[in-house]
Amino acid sequence: LETIESEWEKYQKTNQQNSLTAAAIDNLVKIDREDRLLTLVNLIDPNQNNALTLEQLQQLAKHLQTVAQQRGEADLWQIATGINLGLNTWSNLSNDLTSWLYEQNRNLGFTNDNERVAPWQIWASKVNPSWLKRVLESLANQQAFDSITQDLTLADWVETAIVFQYIQRGLINFFDQRIYSEKLGAKLSISTFLTFALIWSLLTNSFEQVSKNSLYSRGCFQMALQILRTFAQRDYFPLYGGIFASFSGSYLKEALDYLSIPLRYVEGTGEKARILTLIAYSNRIRGDYPQARECHQQALEIARQQQDSACEIANLNHLSRLNAIQKNYTEAINLSQRALILSRQQGNSLGQANALANLGYSQVQEAQQLERYDPEIYQSSIEYLKQGLKLAESLQDWQSKSLCCSSLGLAYLVLERTQDAINILLQGLESAKYYGDVYLQGLLLTYLGEAYYQDKNFEQAIYMGSLGMYWLHEIGAVEWRQAASLLTVIRGKNIAAFEQTFSLERSSLIKSIGLEGYQYISEILSKYQQGN
């Protein structure tokens, strides 16, 4: 009986796989030719209940080749060829998927710099000459994709889609095992999700703007959305972080339409709200405040409908921060108070820490705006900020700690407590570095530049301001202009002294951002002074 049962289960499984493969072939053959690529992308979407497995993809490629020969359809043959190439390439790469993680005395990451080792060149060396190899080499050399998006076949694109998907999924599975620690595993998984989503977003833009190939552009965009959709289901999804990618116009509409498909929610969470939160945060950092506000408002409404209190609190906090940036401090205070009350009711310590940081910061700024100089007002605000900082430290939440430190440091600067500001901002900078938040690092470096300027330590002001401006400019954050303004003021007081100090800081700056980064600082400053 056990043998019969085992054979029956095996038969059912095989029959189901054959049925799925047959259905996939039927879909690809019958659908309009211009829709075949997107249909394939949908068939390999891991968010689907019946996403094709490696074995089923092999069967699909085999049958597609037969159908393509019978019907004389080149695009079906190209798709089949791309699937086979992708499976073979993945087979060659899979053994080296994680070898780059074991480089000694190097930090982990996906960018090549003095402190990190990235996997792109290692993987490129394992790949035969192909369009995929050129993509990997572009990533290794940190080059734009514009020069390679005009010369590829359908098979090239399909191979890349399959290989990148299995690389990303393999790394996520590896990191999610928490082989190092829970926090480090989550951090590496987050980095992987965002890196591959960003790669597909960059390819989307290159195909759209350079090669004018809307088919490949739409395919890349769908791959990015699939990654974000999977990411939104993870318990470590960063409600207080962003991807620094721009979604606008028809692509934003397509994102909303795609994510409106009925989804399996995790603990009542609306994935669409979480992805919108991520996109909105990114838009705020880039300075697109209207788009950020619109996305946060939509995310807030959906989160309430789905009873996702963590997402609701996060968007209240983000909207508070956005209003504070736009100097609408009364509304910022109101939103942060609502976030604080709700987070305390729900026992959401992370939301509470962020709400306290926003509340204290907004109160200090409003008092300055209204020219109120009552010490009790400032002391009350600083107490909120200290509570938030203490809470973030107890959670070992380095991102929230760096946010609290930045707000507290600014409050001290307003009160001209310069040394207190420097001390707390340095703490925040260390936390931001540990967490790997480039935006907060750039912001804290800029604030430190202003603090040292207030302290008349112009050497440190130039050093910190230069680093802050560089990192913020690198990620497209609008606050780079704040750092550039500081450096311009210092330079305006004594050009010769500024240039001499900048030269003296050369070795320290090169150690942090490399020779090209050091040289680029002057270009960024010149760009600001020319009004660009």
What residues fall within each predicted segment?
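Short coil/turn linkers that connect adjacent helices within long alpha-helical scaffolds
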Residues: 265-267, 302-308, 344-348, 390-397, ...
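Alpha-solenoid helical-repeat scaffolds
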Residues: 160-335, 339-342
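Tetratricopeptide repeat
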Residues: 255-259, 292, 296-299, 319, ...
